[in-house]
């Protein structure tokens, strides 16, 4: 009986404790502690601010139970709706910001600022072209060896844009620098298709073979539907030719936010009589401005690409055909994606076909020291057919945004820690002045890196040294693989491309996220960090990126869309980061 009373007493105590805990939880939900209350993003839209409005906003948010604010300068072409527009970081703007800091502090509200004007990512008008995001570019020349050569190499591309000499940004700034000269002895089976004198016909338009195979992306031909509503481009050879790969560029690429698997935009068909065509394969839309795919060896006289989902404008459907090249030797499948020009997430689904008919690793020669200041190469070339590549770098062209015009400039190089250091110290100094020195324990207590949106840069001036330090071998003999050429073997070339992407990801992790987090801590602040948000936006590892934060952050949208599962992945990544690295708090942009 005594034991029964003891058990009943224990049960009663447990029930009472559970009831108290439930009651306590209900009370805390109704009146949450300060650390559990929401923070909000407070956008100062294009200079439409006033002290009167600042005070009203903050007092209203405080009454609503909001515990903190993240103050953004944003633009989005917002029209002026106040009598007097106040420009970013002018003395008058700083006075308003200092007033906001004072009011927020008096109300017990925490304050955060993003890592740049706008919300993505780390850029501003003080970033110089030298310190901005960059891409790798190349020009190619075919020569026959077995003699001393003097070759005037084409100049490196200086265009600001995302790929080669495609102009697709609104950045007027320029920067370019040579990386190196590398020659590759090609297999005897490698033939420039233009030398076979094919004819090019299209559904409606007037491209030339030279224009479609010259590697110049600044010139495109508008190709429209034929009478039956089909858009196509066709090479016809005098005799059957065996083709192992193709590349195609129509000026389109998958946007940063559409990283899911693309719909099928093109297909390849072949024929021997030009009348009856057989489908060879579908061609997924590229994640870059050009796509290279390998093919099963295919022999035919006619090779036709057919567009299934063309663009549309006021004049109707069309394709802006820039390049359409066929190759008689194998190329890297999804070469541009594997070279980092996009962060396509399913590369393991697109392996390159094994082929022994490739350039040997010993058939690569670095010739940088044999080129004079005018770009003239003098070289005793061994026998064989060679392609000489001139590699360079130019600006990627991304700008921070969406900020007010006065706060907009180039995005800093995310792979150059010194450049990021200069950038973030200047940025924090601006806000130290604007806040009257209130950074750290009071005033601006947090920094925030929002989701990554500036695009996929593929080069930094430190890349050769960083690559060799991390991977243990020189990058220079392998640079031609970034163009799609297979060197050594498919396995060796794919390994190099993996190493290249890995290096980009590591440099972003250490140079952007670690440096900005360190800067926040140096100045007494804590930091929120988001990473990919929707899809795979960069080559850095999201968990490693968020591990640099004090508060890892994900994002979610209250929409009914098929791709929202990617946001779930982002939230799971965020919670995983907190569990693995012992973060007390997790934030959600929602």
Walk through the language-model features, giving the residues of each.
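The substrate-binding groove and active-site-proximal loops of carbohydrate-active enzymes
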Residues: 38-50, 79-95, 122-125, 283, ...
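Aromatic, loop-rich ligand-recognition surfaces of beta-strand-rich domains
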Residues: 214-279, 286-360, 451
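Acidic/aromatic-lined carbohydrate-recognition and catalytic surfaces
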Residues: 74-195, 330-337, 344-345, 355, ...
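Catalytic-core region of carbohydrate-active enzymes that cleave or remodel glycosidic bonds
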Residues: 59-61, 102-105, 521, 526, ...
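Catalytic domains of carbohydrate-active enzymes, especially glycoside hydrolases
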Residues: 53-74, 96-102, 442, 545, ...
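Aromatic-lined carbohydrate-recognition surfaces of secreted/lumenal glycan-active proteins
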Residues: 111-122, 448-451, 506-538, 590
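Bacterial Sec-dependent N-terminal signal peptides
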Residues: 1-25
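Substrate-binding cleft/loops of secretory-pathway carbohydrate-active enzymes
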Residues: 119-132, 451-461, 528-561
